[in-house]
A protein has these predicted regions:
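N-terminal hydrophobic/helix-forming segments and targeting peptides
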Residues: 1-436
Length: 436
């Protein structure tokens, strides 16, 4: 991937692979290992070398990679995204029913509920399996349609097209075939284990459709999980293009649980990045003063997609700042500080994009629409570095199938690559020196 041209097809493969946060993390880890990054389990002692390339995972659903500085620590570059997407979590394997094979689910994140109806679904996640030495995780995702969530037909619900209010407990429970089916047995066979050895599991429903180009000229693409695996992959690509500097460390991180508040151990409010920074600094003999100075001379990208102006509902977007798919990377602002971008950090990122030849669009909500939040301001509590919130415009965010721009994906990759190759220094508060 390093020194290779950005490929939209490789992004598609990443989107297709990321059927759960565990699968997204495994896919990213495989890319890192192929690029020579060494796995450092959190439970092991780390032996870190100047200029070394490493990565670690937490809970199997978050991953952080880094390049060690080659000299005295002077600052950090980092890009953060998330591995999870809205879906349905399976509460238990099998539920008693007189007619159908069923399993109870509950909503994970703020999905568009109707988008999950009447489409072929599979099950993805991890099994926790008993072994002779203890417990192991096994990823599973059968490559076939295992389930669907059936709509109530229009004949039994004449108001269906007049604004249906869905009750997840009643209207959105999946079926897994006829009576007598056993989901646990099917997943055990998929993983090559005995059903009685499965002690627990973290499982979700996943769409079966693959990422595909869309549009008369193929300029758009559709896929599940574009939010936020598009940013995860494009920032990873940019990270891998980084040359590194004598005193700067480079970090790429993909957290879990952003869609439900980031408050888990593996989320942005957890200590993953702070813990890794502390271990790196300790291995380098960095003093508290050096640490504070280096963090001041840093810039962190919080990369999470935003809303493109909808073709049928342009009134939902800020009229002064329309977002066009294919119009470039989003620079996200919010007066309530749900986005971390300030004029100071926004200026630095804009300058970097200009050098890369990447267009920038301002993303802001209407003054009467509060909008969503992301992981940047939550991560900021842990690491205390200057940050900027960025993303890419997309349609149908949190739908089972979303839509985005092929050109924008390449814009993000180019911008992030330029960022990792641009020296950044803050000689005094409110002033940047950029190696442009």
């Amino acid at each position: 991937m390093k020194n290779a041209a950005f490929s939209i097809e490789e992004l598609f493969r990443f989107l297709d692979a990321g059927v759960s946060a565990f699968h997204s993390t495994a896919a990213a880890s495989a890319i890192l290992e192929a690029e020579g990054y060494v796995n450092c389990p959190e439970s092991a002692a780390w032996e870190l070398a100047p200029g070394g390339k490493y990565y670690t995972t937490r809970n199997g659903s978050a991953v952080l990679a880094w390049r060690m500085p080659r000299g005295e620590l002077t600052g950090w570059h980092a890009a953060a995204s998330h591995s999870d997407s809205p879906t349905w979590r399976i509460k238990q394997f099998d539920t008693e029913d007189k007619v159908f094979a069923k399993a109870e689910v509950e909503g994970y994140g703020g999905m568009i509920m109707p988008s999950w109806l009447d489409r072929p679904l599979t099950v993805a996640g991890r099994l926790l399996v008993r072994t002779e030495s203890g417990i192991e995780s096994r990823l599973v995702c059968p490559d076939r349609a295992l389930a669907c969530i059936p709509n109530l037909c229009i004949h039994f619900n004449h108001d269906l097209n007049n604004g249906m209010k869905y009750n997840p407990q009643v209207d959105l429970q999946p079926i897994f075939g006829g009576k007598g089916g056993n989901l646990k047995e099917v997943l055990a066979a998929e993983a090559g284990v005995k059903a009685e050895d499965i002690l627990d599991a973290d499982l979700v429903l996943a769409t079966r459709e693959k990422a595909v180009r869309m549009g008369l000229n193929g300029e758009y693409f559709m896929s599940g999980r574009i939010d936020d695996l598009e940013c995860a992959y494009t920032t990873l690509w940019g990270f891998l293009q980084g040359r590194g500097e004598e005193g700067r460390g480079d970090i790429w991180v993909m957290f879990d649980n952003e869609e439900v508040g980031s408050s888990s151990r593996q989320g942005a409010q957890g200590t993953l990045m702070a813990d890794v920074l502390a271990r790196i600094e300790e291995s380098m003999g960095v003093s508290r003063e050096q640490s504070i100075r280096a963090r001041t001379n840093s810039l962190v990208l919080s990369a999470d997609n935003g809303h493109a102006t909808h073709p049928n509902h342009p009134e939902k977007s800020d009229p002064a700042n329309p977002v066009v798919m294919g119009g470039g990377v989003l620079l996200k602002y919010n007066a309530r500080q749900t986005y971390t971008t300030s004029g100071f950090t926004g200026a630095a990122f804009t300058a970097i994009c200009k050098k890369a030849g990447v267009p920038v669009q301002v993303f802001a909500n209407r003054a009467d629409v509060p909008g969503g939040s992301t992981l940047g301001n939550l991560l900021g509590h842990q690491i205390l570095m200057p940050m900027v919130d960025i993303g890419l415009g997309q349609l149908a965010m949190h739908s089972a199938m979303e839509t985005a721009s092929c050109a924008d994906a390449e814009y993000m990759a180019k911008a992030v690559a330029e960022y990792y190759n641009t020296p950044i220094f803050q000689p005094k508060d409110g002033e940047w020196k950029l190696g442009l």
